[in-house]
Curated annotation (Swiss-Prot):
InterPro entries: PSI_Ycf4_assembly. The keyword Thylakoid applies. Seems to be required for the assembly of the photosystem I complex. The keyword Nucleotide-binding does not apply. Keywords: Chloroplast, Membrane, Photosynthesis, Plastid, Thylakoid, Transmembrane, Transmembrane helix. It comes from the Eukaryota. It comes from Oenothera elata subsp. hookeri (Hooker's evening primrose). It is found in: Plastid, Chloroplast thylakoid membrane. Belongs to the Ycf4 family. The chain crosses the membrane at residues 19-39, 64-84. GO terms for biological process: photosynthesis. This is Photosystem I assembly protein Ycf4. It is a multi-pass membrane protein. The gene is ycf4.
Length: 184
């Protein structure tokens, strides 16, 4: 979501609370839970899942391997659920022409550096840079080039913006900030 006025541009950034992350975390949890149940039922010799008979799967090596993959999947699923609940990567970009300040805020993982807050003067912005890599894994990222700081990404590489959308966004932001656009 973008909110703009004559002097201020605020863009809210969606972090890890995307529908795709919810779907992946849910599917991974169900799949790995199924693997753990099949491995456990082969160990106990009881049918915990009615789809597979425990006599068809021997505990060593199939049941053991399925249990291992199930436990690994549960760990990965719990990691995804934690990033969703902490909303890692969300935040905002705030460009204030009146005060001449740019603020970039993102939520990180819990700990000492949970809040990532960057603040720059607008006159330190050299350019808005578009990086485009075409091919099977196309990647289009928008950067803000800062004197002495390097390039700071403004969009995620997994946003999957079309070339037209990223060009439009770069042009609007460069016009608002009154800086040139570079394309790589």
């Amino acid at each position: 979501m973008i909110w703009r006025s004559e002097h201020i541009w605020i863009e809210l950034i969606v972090g890890s609370r995307k529908i795709s992350n919810f779907c992946w975390a849910f599917l991974l949890f169900l799949g790995s839970l199924g693997f753990v149940l099949v491995g456990t039922s082969s160990y106990l010799g009881k049918n915990l899942i009615s789809l597979v008979s425990s006599q068809q799967i021997h505990f060593f090596p199939q049941g053991l391997v399925m249990s291992f993959y199930g436990i690994a999947g549960l760990f990965i699923s719990s990691y995804l659920w934690c990033t969703i609940s902490w909303n890692v990567g969300s935040g905002y970009d705030r460009f204030d022409r009146k005060e001449g300040i740019v603020c970039i805020f993102r939520w990180g993982f819990p700990g000492k550096n949970r809040r990532i807050f960057l603040r720059f003067r607008m006159k330190d912005i050299q350019s808005i840079r578009i990086e485009v890599k075409e091919g099977i894994y196309a990647r289009r990222v928008l950067y803000m080039e800062i004197k002495g700081q390097g390039a700071i990404p403004l969009t995620r590489s997994d946003d999957n913006l079309t070339l037209r959308e990223i060009e439009q966004k770069a042009a609007e932001l460069a016009y608002f900030l009154r800086v040139p656009i570079e394309v790589f």
